């Protein structure tokens, strides 16, 4: 019995650090029926692949460990957006409230340190006054940390909340002890506990604000989705909500208006700005029968379209979904941070205890020892580790989408930086994929025979012959016993005679001589044209030559890759001479050209290079490229290709420009560099900060501030990718 596998995304609330996301991920993966689950701290989302369970059970499992979960679908998106705004407003209010109460305590402390002992300063140094100001900060504003710490300890997965709760509580408790039960010390630390909470809350608020900017690419794409459409019904034009548009509706789109949804032009011509989908700045000319896509802009002509796709099935919706999935995925390099985050908080708790005991034993000043210990607790930051990789991936995939490069996940984004070999399919990748008949050699009737045979073919060369036949007025004849021979040609019976159309290799297998056409065929192939022969069971009757224009940017793109040290190969089912001619024109070495390759053999060449230690990227656009795309380290599909190719590939180039391959590698390298910088900063910050705190070089307030802003530095570094021009 077939298993019904589902994939759902949930928005997770209540996470504060990498330990939270790791705990939720572990809990989801332990649920019966769950095949895999990943939780992303930066996007605050969980992606769950499951069979025998329900979304309600999954949500309940998250709630049971102290977090919130909401199914991320169309029905809940508005609610999720509203709850996020409410949460941010509440956090902003708490931050302002906390700052108002903390500021007098801080100013009084600074004034006292500067030698001021006036009545106002003395008033704010009264134990009861400080307690009244610090109490709401500690237990109202800081309640979020206590709540988080409770759930973390309950599930035996201590997180940042535990560190903050213990650290600030220790400072607060010491202040109460000194203020109301004085022995030998009257020092109060209410300003320290309050300031730590205020600074950490400020850091969290800025972190949430910065994190929202990492998703700007998604927001920009979502803004392309129109709210209304002009529809023709019963001969009258009316405005309706986009949700009311149905397949086969006729929509009217005026110059300057956005296309509401995908459809085919049935009246009018225009040029459409597709830059938001493809990154291509030049408007694309469109005429009747051409497809247009939702979110694109009609620049000059009035057009009518017949709707073909709506809602989540439109190209724009699928692109948004692909980018969201990519931003929620994990790169292999993140495993380092995940492993460290899992043991980070217990280690910090242990170091804080060691600091307390050793400092107290050496100095005999247990209050000083406690302050050193508090500094260790509040400076340690697992958040920076948790955000280092996902924030860079979010921004990197967003930059890619803006440039027409759709990267499906963190693994592909990281893997592209390591590519040192690229295999290019010829037809539709190096060439335009729109072959045309250039030469017909043989008696006139071969056009009709070719035309009849190729009518049933799906091959691009076959379609070129059919288009030529229609253009010259060829007549189709009834055909029986039609057979497609992958990589070789086609055959069928017409008027009782069995014919074959295809390659010379197939003719040789049939023991047919083509000496009569040998010289002309050689000349055509050396010019880079593909020659197809027509034969019956006795002799070769003639041949047709087909040429496909090389893409304008092909030579430049290949040169760019070679300058990067990437070996470029070409694979094609075409004959050796035609393949070498094309390869020479675009600058591919002759020994890097694989010709006369059957569709099922393309994957073999990928495997061969991989066995030689190469990191291989495969670029293709057809159904027969799918196995090779799947096997490659990074499969790259051209946006003009088949759905199967794009579904199999790790990356889709929406504009079909070969120069986008180089952009993809540059973007991948830049993103990986940011990830490494982020991880380095997070490691160094904790490696240096914790010893400094333990030895008393940082007081708790400075330690808390450093902790708060360490995450911000990681986010800002990731966001700097937005300013990078990828070439």
UniProtKB/Swiss-Prot annotation:
How pH affects activity? Optimum pH is 6.25.
The cellular location(s) given in this protein's UniProt record come to: Cell membrane
Regulation acting on activity, per entry: Inhibited by vanadate.
Concerning PROSITE patterns, the annotation shows: ATPASE_E1_E2, HMA_1, HMA_2
Q: What does this protein do?
A: Probably involved in copper import under copper limiting conditions.
Tell me the organism: Enterococcus hirae (strain ATCC 9790 / DSM 20160 / JCM 8729 / LMG 6399 / NBRC 3181 / NCIMB 6459 / NCDO 1258 / NCTC 12367 / WDCM 00089 / R)
Residues bound to Cu(+) are 17, 20
Q: Which residues form the active site?
A: 425 (4-aspartylphosphate intermediate)
- Report TM segments: 95-115, 120-137, 162-181, 188-203, 342-362, 376-396, 679-698, 701-721
Domain HMA positions? 6-70
> Subunit composition?
Monomer. Interacts with the copper chaperone CopZ.
Topological domains (Cytoplasmic): residue ranges? 1-94, 138-161, 204-341, 397-678, 722-727
Write down the SUPFAM superfamilies for this protein, in alphabetical order. Answer: Calcium ATPase, transduction domain A, Calcium ATPase, transmembrane domain M, HAD-like, HMA, heavy metal-associated domain
Gene3D superfamilies listed in its UniProt record: 3.30.70.100, Calcium-transporting ATPase, cytoplasmic domain N, Calcium-transporting ATPase, cytoplasmic transduction domain A, HAD superfamily/HAD-like
Name under which the protein is recorded: Probable copper-importing P-type ATPase A
GO MF term (any one)? ATP hydrolysis activity
């Amino acid at each position: 019995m077939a298993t019904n596998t589902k994939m759902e995304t949930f928005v997770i609330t209540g996470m504060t650090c990498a330990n939270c996301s790791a705990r939720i991920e572990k809990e989801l993966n332990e649920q019966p029926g769950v095949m895999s689950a990943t939780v992303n701290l930066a996007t605050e989302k969980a992606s769950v692949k499951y069979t025998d369970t329900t979304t309600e059970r999954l949500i309940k499992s998250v709630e049971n460990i102290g977090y919130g979960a909401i199914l991320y679908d169309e029905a809940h998106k508005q609610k999720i957006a509203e709850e996020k705004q409410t949460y941010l407003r509440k956090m902003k209010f708490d931050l302002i409230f906390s700052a108002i109460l903390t500021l007098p305590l801080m100013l009084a402390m600074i004034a006292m340190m500067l030698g001021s002992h006036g009545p106002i300063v003395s008033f704010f140094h009264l134990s009861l006054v400080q307690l009244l100001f610090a109490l709401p900060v500690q237990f109202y504003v800081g309640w979020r940390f206590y709540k988080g710490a409770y759930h973390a300890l309950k599930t035996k997965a201590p997180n940042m909340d535990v560190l903050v709760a213990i650290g600030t509580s220790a400072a607060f408790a010491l202040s109460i002890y000194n203020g109301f039960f004085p022995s030998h010390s009257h020092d109060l630390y209410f300003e320290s506990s309050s300031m730590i909470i205020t600074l950490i809350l400020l850091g969290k608020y800025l972190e949430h604000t910065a994190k929202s900017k990492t998703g700007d690419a998604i927001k920009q794409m979502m803004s392309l989705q129109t709210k209304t459409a002009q529809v023709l019904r019963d001969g009258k034009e009316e405005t309706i909500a986009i949700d009311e548009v149905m397949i086969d509706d006729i929509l009217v789109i005026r110059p300057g208006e956005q296309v509401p949804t995908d459809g085919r032009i049935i009246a009018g011509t225009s040029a459409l700005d597709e830059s938001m989908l493809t990154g291509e700045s030049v408007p694309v000319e469109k005429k009747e029968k051409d497809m247009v896509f939702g979110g694109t802009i009609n620049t000059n002509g009035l057009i009518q379209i017949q709707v073909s796709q709506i809602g989540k099935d439109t190209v724009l919706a699928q692109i948004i979904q692909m980018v969201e999935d990519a931003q929620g995925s994990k790169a292999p390099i993140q495993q380092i941070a995940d492993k460290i985050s899992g043991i980070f908080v217990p280690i910090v708790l242990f170091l804080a205890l060691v600091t307390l005991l050793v400092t107290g034993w050496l100095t005999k000043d247990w209050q000083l020892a406690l302050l050193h210990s508090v500094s260790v607790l509040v400076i340690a930051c697992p958040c920076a580790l948790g955000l280092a990789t996902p924030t860079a991936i979010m921004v990197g995939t967003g930059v890619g989408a803006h440039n027409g490069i759709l990267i499906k996940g963190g693994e592909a984004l990281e893997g592209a930086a390591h590519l040192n070999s690229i295999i290019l399919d010829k037809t539709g990748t190096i060439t335009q994929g729109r072959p045309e008949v250039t030469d017909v050699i043989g008696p006139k009737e071969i056009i009709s025979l070719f035309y009849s045979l190729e009518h049933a073919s799906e091959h691009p060369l076959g379609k070129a012959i059919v288009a030529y036949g229609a253009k010259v007025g060829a007549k189709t004849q009834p055909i029986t016993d039609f057979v497609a021979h992958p990589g070789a040609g086609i055959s069928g019976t017409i008027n009782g005679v069995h014919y074959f159309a295809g390659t010379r290799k197939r003719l040789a297998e049939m023991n047919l001589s083509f000496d009569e056409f040998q010289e002309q065929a050689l000349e055509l192939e050396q010019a880079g044209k593909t020659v197809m022969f027509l034969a019956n069971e006795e002799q070769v009757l003639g041949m047709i030559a087909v040429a496909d224009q090389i893409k304008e940017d092909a030579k430049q793109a290949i040169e760019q890759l070679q300058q990067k040290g990437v070996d470029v190969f070409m694979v094609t089912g075409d004959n050796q001479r035609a393949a070498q001619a094309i390869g020479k024109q675009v600058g591919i070495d002759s020994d890097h050209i694989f010709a006369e390759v059957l569709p099922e053999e393309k994957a073999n060449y990928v495997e061969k290079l991989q066995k030689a230690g190469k990191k291989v990227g495969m670029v293709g656009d057809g159904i027969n490229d799918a196995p090779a795309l799947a096997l490659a380290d990074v499969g790259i599909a051209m946006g003009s290709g088949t759905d199967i190719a794009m579904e199999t590939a790790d990356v889709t180039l929406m504009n079909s420009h070969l120069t986008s391959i180089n952009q993809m590698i540059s973007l991948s390298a830049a993103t990986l560099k940011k990830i490494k910088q982020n991880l380095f900063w997070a490691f160094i910050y904790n490696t240096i900060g914790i010893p400094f705190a333990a030895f008393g070089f940082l007081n708790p307030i400075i330690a808390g501030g450093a902790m708060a802003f360490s995450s911000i530095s990681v986010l800002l570094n990731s966001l700097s990718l937005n300013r990078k021009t990828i070439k």
